């Protein structure tokens, strides 16, 4: 039971709920009332939301993986990786989430008959890794990157 709670803390479950609800609210309260022709069915749209949630969760995981040394000093009490979840398991979840997101993202891109859209998902995965590895220490570029990814999660709803 404690491992499940740690896992939900690692992926920041509450934040993921907010991400999903934001996409759902935009779709059903802002886009649907004004558009009649939708490429994605409701179930396919839910897959898009799932893809966003998986990529976001993997971003939280990789961020915590790269922060282990810093968290040992600054956040020893709230550190998850290296205490209740090993680095190896965290990396495994990171890979699984990204692979699932990529497969679903490619599937959705094929549905809308534009496989180039799958590059959006690849960009998001790579961008979150780059942020965690290098950009986090750069105030300007790190914040710009996070802002762009946040905007992209909203833009994707309209794009698909």
PLM features per residue range, with description:
Residues 1-19, 69, 75-93, 129-149:
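Interhelical loop and helix-boundary elements at the membrane-water interface
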Residues 95-160:
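A feature for the membrane-embedded catalytic helix bundles of lipid/isoprenoid biosynthetic enzymes
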Residues 25, 77-80, 155:
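Residues in and immediately flanking transmembrane alpha helices
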Residues 20-66, 101, 105, 116-129, ...:
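Membrane-embedded alpha-helical segments that form the functional core of polytopic membrane enzymes
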Residues 2, 36-44, 113, 135, ...:
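Membrane-helix interfacial "entry" motifs
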Residues 29-36, 70, 111, 134:
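Juxtamembrane transmembrane-helix termini
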Residues 50, 68-121:
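Multi-pass membrane catalytic core of lipid/isoprenoid biosynthesis enzymes
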